[in-house]
């Protein structure tokens, strides 16, 4: 019988459909083999690593890990992170995806169908749309202590259908990638998103095109060309854009300009200030609360 629970004991996790919500401090997971699961945070950040990628999960993105994937995860005590992670019992999302695709007549004839194995491309997704709304409602109910078993079960049904729709969206996006053969497009999609997630997750490090190309398992020139065709900007343009967006958020909360420049990967304060002004139209210090025009 399917069980739907909130914050179950860790050993039960592989056998139930569950929502984990909490405020871990100096929390580390090493080489855990997961069921199909979704990784999100309400506040702060969590770092995930799998054999194929590195991911920084923040409130504006979420990560889906497929059944059987091994991952490690860490949360720093000082980050004030609140995690929100649904785990799905084996077969649950498969059945939902099959039901969404099959007609009523077929389902009447085959009530026990479980569907084909469900798998999504391992990548960061923007925390928008139905999935973000469902997660927000689940978190609000848990915090308010009104997340009964029946209510949680309904939300997991909604979430499973939303994941099936996300897989359909991903397949449509794959069709837009620059390659003739379908298999090539799918593989290029996986590799380019792996590198893209690496760039936006490791932005504080001194990254290069060659390093990102190695993550994608492509030659630097092939990677650079394919990345620009797929995402409309070069790898370094995307990295710079992301660094400046993170910097804007850090400055708005009151962090020092020099500390922010270093935190987002700039080794020159002058270069950071010039690029920031060019992108946002104001000097970095003008975004800090109570500080105006001091750069």
Predicted segments, located by residue:
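N-terminal regulatory/effector-sensing and dimerization cores
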Residues: 2-112, 143-150
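Residue-level signal for well-ordered alpha-helical positions
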Residues: 76-77, 99-100, 166, 250, ...
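Hydrophobic recognition helices of helix-based DNA-binding modules
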Residues: 96, 159-167, 227, 251
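An amphipathic alpha-helical interaction segment
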Residues: 112-197
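Flexible coil/turn residues that form the inter-helical turn or adjacent wing/linker of helix-turn-helix
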Residues: 145, 205, 253-255, 265
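Basic/polar phosphate-binding segments, predominantly the helix-turn-helix DNA-binding elements
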Residues: 168-169, 175-189, 194-242, 261-290
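Short helix-to-turn junction characteristic of helix-turn-helix DNA-binding domains
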Residues: 199-202, 247-254
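Hydrophobic positions on the alpha-helical face of helix-turn-helix-like DNA-binding modules
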Residues: 247, 260-261
């Amino acid at each position: 019988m399917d069980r739907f629970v909130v914050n179950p004991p860790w050993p039960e996790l592989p056998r139930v459909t569950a929502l984990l919500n909490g405020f871990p401090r100096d929390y580390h997971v090493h080489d855990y083999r997961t069921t199909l699961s979704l990784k999100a945070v309400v506040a702060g950040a969590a770092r995930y690593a799998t054999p194929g990628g590195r991911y920084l999960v923040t409130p504006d993105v979420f990560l889906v890990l497929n059944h059987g994937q091994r991952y490690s995860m860490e949360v720093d005590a000082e980050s004030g992170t609140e995690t929100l992670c649904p785990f799905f019992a084996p077969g649950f999302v498969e059945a939902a995806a099959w039901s969404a695709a099959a007609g009523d007549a077929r389902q009447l004839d085959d009530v026990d169908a479980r569907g084909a194995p469900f798998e999504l491309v391992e990548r960061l997704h923007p925390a928008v749309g139905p999935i973000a709304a469902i997660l927000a409602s689940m978190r609000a109910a848990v915090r308010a202590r009104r997340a009964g078993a029946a209510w949680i079960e309904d939300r997991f049904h909604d979430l499973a259908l939303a994941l099936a729709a996300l897989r359909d969206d991903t397949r449509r996006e794959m069709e837009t990638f620059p390659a003739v053969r379908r298999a090539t497009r799918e593989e290029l999609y996986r590799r380019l998103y792996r590198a893209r997630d690496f760039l936006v997750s490791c932005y504080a490090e001194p990254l290069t095109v060659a390093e990102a190309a190695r993550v994608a398992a492509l030659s630097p020139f092939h990677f650079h060309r394919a990345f620009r065709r797929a995402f409309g900007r070069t790898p370094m343009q995307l990295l710079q854009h992301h660094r400046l967006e993170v910097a804007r958020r850090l400055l708005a909360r009151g962090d020092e300009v020099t500390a922010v420049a270093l935190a987002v990967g700039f080794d020159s304060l002058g270069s950071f200030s010039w690029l920031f002004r060019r992108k946002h139209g104001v000097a970095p210090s003008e975004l800090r609360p109570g500080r105006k025009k001091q750069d």
